[in-house]
């Protein structure tokens, strides 16, 4: 055949498919075989367009025809001139009839061969990624006709034809594992990504190592719970694979290679604890609060064998600062530091070893930087459930006074005959064991319990083990001399014994301390927890507070003092009925919490003088060193307050002694002799105020109430109202209420702010921190005032409840008795007690509107020489740099005051006393 010169011209519009000749069998599928004509003398553009139109018509018509078997001609290939080095059969595997051969398709003999790569990211199910289809045909290998049309799908469909998809594509690119919370793209070589029935994803290894112990009767129980479902919907959904075949493979592999229960160190609940639902913060950072379960390191208990050795005693463990807050041990086991006398010189009391050791196992020890649920909130939450269900059988103050602190609470199976078991909530106190049958515990805020039984005391409790997971306890029921037997198991038809072993350790050793991570292993924690950490401004937090919904209509906030985990402060908020009906939604809770504006803080304003009320229950002072601490604390306070007033009250609210500390507390016997003293004088704040301050309180007085007695409303001094001690010109008293010993019950609905200290040792430290006191050796009054100004402690105290700010107050003890004039000048906010209106000797003028911008808050008091001799100790306490500004302020006030003549005449006879508010 003759070639025309135009056949060798390569044009971008030229289609080689129209200029080729048959030289053998075609390498096309049957629907691609067409009759090609010889090239004509038309232009390359016309010939290419004509060939394309014919091919398109053929494709549309061939779709309607029935497929036929390949003929021998279908195996022939196109051949071109050797100079062109172009072939239509080597188009990167595009052998399908729906693909068009292009003139730029170069032979694969001259292309680099790239290795086959696999991505670590999961891909949608597709036949292209199957092992059977991984070997694609090469250009130099003739394709197999029986596999080309079926195994290799078209990559590009012709125009007008729908694309057939065999599966729904899912994008897992940004998904994370529900167990380890890491991106699913971070996986080991060959590790699979498992899609769960709930819609979340999990690594294969994460799911396998999370399998827990189970019995043959309940194989599905080995799958852990999905943390994302728990966090998003608050539902317990197991991580079960969506593929049933894969699920069966995992179960069979686990049962074949199952490890005995005694060899398992951790279970899915401890390794991947469910997150409690958290309330999103309002511009504040927070960390989800986790709950972990304690598991004893003792081996499984066999019948009639000796129990595993209890944990180490406290004196066997090195002392260190506590990483776990609000720990407690019975008072009988406490060891107060012998060097209590050193408290006069150094108020930075170190934590005792009893408060620094946690009983949690190292295998489940939480990280130190984790945000944790505070133990007081958990205690109040569980005790509130008891009180809500048994209001007639239980009294709140008796739980704290007679039962002691709550140590453990779990949901266990209880039987009295060893045959019939009932699901109960079990509460282990320091001196009581309480069980209550479960009626309904679906809603964590509406738990229903019934059939309460209290066993106390538990000092003579006898305990034996019948089987590996069955515990038998013999103990006395309350108000009954007969002994009762209780059989305790964790679950029926199960060999699990980790929770039972935890209870065995707690019963055998009263010093075994359970913190917020392991106080419960089977019950949900608080539904809402929020961190209100306050940044003071120098990189540290003053308090770390937590807010929890312990009742459908009660929110409690608990915080601890910076650098002292043994002192806590709490307050509560009651929600109205309209808000309670919408507690199921998080948005309604957020709207309620926005009303909480003041910051929970122990900071108070430094007073001029202090009055301290001590209610001591001597039956609870099992250590003689406690009286030494009380005596040393009072003597230490006299260094800062020479006119310190005291009042001792017994546990029945009767006055034992009162007066000045310098005059009456001269030795330790002054306090020890109060044990045998009795009195008929009932204590009340009104009586104490009229006794110590028969007239108005002219100075800035701080009132402190400390008690270690029972929290009975009619007998405890902490429930009484101390507003009568409000200093003149203030709206509320500068008070501080301290309870020695931690509480189970939350009394925040009756007490605005209550501080709980672990022992008498921390009472003085709490006072120093709250009122800004310091016992440095080279500290004097002038340095204190300068330090207060430079350190901006007046600004830091703005978070407290004290309202003495932004006003300049003038106190004048006038020699004139002008009732009408003085009554008109008294501020309307001042609260006057009955009988004080007839004899007013104090004149107060608030002049905040004329206060210069550079003048601090100053109180000016004009005293006579006879009355002011003892009250002018701080006459020269003012910084020298502010004297000129104060003089200007005084001149401005006197010019605008209607009593300027009175002040000018009084300056000649009476000295002017000035100090900071």
From Swiss-Prot:
Composition-biased stretches (Acidic residues): 778-794
InterPro entries found in the cross-reference section: Ste5_C_sf, Ste5_Fus-binding, Ste5_Fus3-bd_dom
Residue stretches of biased makeup (Low complexity): 69-84
Skewed-composition ranges (Polar residues): 16-25, 85-110, 118-138, 799-821
GO molecular function terms noted in the UniProt entry: G-protein beta-subunit binding; kinase binding; MAP-kinase scaffold activity; phosphatidylinositol-4,5-bisphosphate binding
Region described as Disordered: spans on this chain: 1-25, 58-151, 778-821
Signal peptide limits: none
GO BP term (any one): pheromone-dependent signal transduction involved in conjugation with cellular fusion
Transmembrane among keywords: no
Modification note: May be regulated at the phosphorylation level, and by the mating type of the cell and depends on an intact pheromone-response pathway.
Sites of Phosphoserine modification: 329
Principal place of residence: cytoplasm
Gene3D superfamilies: Protein Ste5, Fus3-binding domain
Keywords: Cytoplasm, Pheromone response, Phosphoprotein
GO annotations of cellular component type: cytoplasm; mating projection tip; mating projection tip membrane; nucleus; plasma membrane
Places the protein is found: Cytoplasm
Keyword Cell wall biogenesis/degradation belongs to the record: no
Stored Pfam families: Ste5, Ste5_C
Function text: Component of the pheromone signal transduction pathway. It mediates pheromone signals acting between STE20 and STE11. It is absolutely required for pheromone-induced transcription of FUS1. May play a role in cell-cycle arrest in response to pheromone.
Family from the record: To yeast FAR1.
Additional remark text: Present with 1900 molecules/cell in log phase SD medium.
Protein name: Protein STE5
Organism listed in the record: Saccharomyces cerevisiae (strain ATCC 204508 / S288c) (Baker's yeast)
Upper lineage: Eukaryota, Fungi, Dikarya, Ascomycota, Saccharomycotina
